[in-house]
A protein has these predicted regions:
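Intrinsically disordered, low-complexity and often Lys/Arg-enriched segments
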Residues: 1-7, 106-110
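Compact nucleic-acid interaction/catalytic patches
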Residues: 2-3, 11-57
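C-terminal terminal-subdomain/extension
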Residues: 59-110
Length: 110
């Protein structure tokens, strides 16, 4: 798949200089046309990581964490090749997004 067409939950390399994580997770669905994609950094685990806000991923037999709280929009030109898919972790990723966007516990009244 060409780097210009990343799909939802693809894990890709990037071309962002000075960025701390080796990979980005595509959070924006591929059917939404845009010149950028909403992504979350994928980094090595840090002490104190909370599973719901930093779900675990395994890429090439190495454990990483998705930094959902650090999601941002990145131009398509900054996205490089696909290295894996996080489809098997979709439930954990969506739970983290739900908590960030809707509060904890999910569905808690405002």
């Amino acid at each position: 798949m060409p780097p210009s067409s990343p799909r939802w939950l693809d894990i890709v390399r990037h071309r962002i200089r000075g960025f701390r994580g080796p990979y980005l997770l595509i959070l924006q669905h591929h059917n939404i046309p845009a010149a950028s994609r909403i992504v979350a950094p994928v980094t090595l685990p840090l002490r104190g990581d909370v599973d719901v806000l930093a779900p675990r991923l395994t890429i090439h037999d190495v454990e990483y964490r998705v930094r959902i709280l650090d999601m941002s929009a990145v131009p398509l030109a900054m996205l490089a090749d696909r290295v894996a898919s996080a489809a098997d972790s979709a439930d954990a990723i969506m739970s983290g997004l739900d908590i960030i966007l809707h509060g904890y516990p999910v569905g808690m009244p405002l």
